[in-house]
Amino acid sequence: MSLKIRLARGGAKKRPYYRIVIADARSPRDGRFIEKIGTFNPLLAKDAENRVVLDADKAKAWLEKGAQPTDRVARFLDAAGLMKRDAKNNPKKGEPGEKAKERAKERAEKAAAGSTEDAAAE
């Protein structure tokens, strides 16, 4: 049985509230879980002390048993000092895609061709 430490969504429409739970990886997101170890309220300010409430002892025990945290929960555990999370680096994130590069190249060629025609006409 593969265990995950993940978020289970609760709350109303457009008002999310999450429980941090231990669940079987095959169970639905909001379905059956083994144990609740904390909560996460994304509507609170990032510096609010009760935005993420986590029972560190339970989380540590489940990590020792082999439960794998999801990416978001791994951030919370890293902030709490329970595990080390490597920062991700994507150097190509800000680059435009292939089609955008092609369109920019075509625009540059048209602009260059247009400026040479204007110079030849004068």
Swiss-Prot record:
GO cellular component, one term: cytoplasm
Low complexity biased stretches: 111-122
Protein known as: Small ribosomal subunit protein bS16
UniProt GO molecular function: structural constituent of ribosome
Biased composition (Basic and acidic residues): 83-110
Family matches, as SUPFAM superfamilies: Ribosomal protein S16
Keyword Ribosomal protein recorded: yes
Family to which this protein belongs: Belongs to the bacterial ribosomal protein bS16 family.
InterPro entries registered for this protein in UniProt: Ribosomal_bS16 (IPR000307), Ribosomal_bS16_CS (IPR020592), Ribosomal_bS16_dom_sf (IPR023803)
The organism of origin for this protein: Xanthobacter autotrophicus (strain ATCC BAA-1158 / Py2)
